[in-house]
Amino acid sequence: MSKYYLKAGYDIESLKFCKTEDAIVVDIPMLLHGKLNYGLEHVKNLLRSHNIFPSELGFDILTLATMVYLADTRIARLIHGQDSWTREIVIQLPVSDVDLWNKQITTVERMLKFLTGDLWGFEFVKRNWSFEQNEKAEEKTALYSRASLFSGGMDSLISTINLM
């Protein structure tokens, strides 16, 4: 079993792995050639094309989700899990407001443990990169009246049918 320590950074130039006594440390570059990495640039552009401009906090949430997704899809349970299932993952994440996020650590860790069965830890550090909002949002149009998450499972199918 290996503990993973994933360090996201906007000043990291390339993906680097380092094995220590108690963990595998991975430096994860959030920028590639000056653009957001791991699909975040595409998401940013797609949102902007729909006149949606996330705040710095909204961008923090997108980055958190991206790092959780990377960890979940790249760290094999069979190889790195304590019981061939439970993994131990710590994520160091640059955010816009460290104090705000530190108040949410327990909630985020418990939520992810419930959803994945893994042991999660978070360290929030000050983000040294700004999610620029050069354009001004125009008047929003009411294209949608509500949203529903749909995973394809029976419970979300029933919920979606009830909305129709």
Where do the language-model regions lie?
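Hydrophobic/small residue at the entry helix of a nucleotide-binding pocket
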Residues: 155-156
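Catalytic nucleophile serine of serine hydrolases
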Residues: 150-151
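RNA-binding accessory domains that recognize and position tRNA/RNA substrates
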Residues: 1-147, 160-164
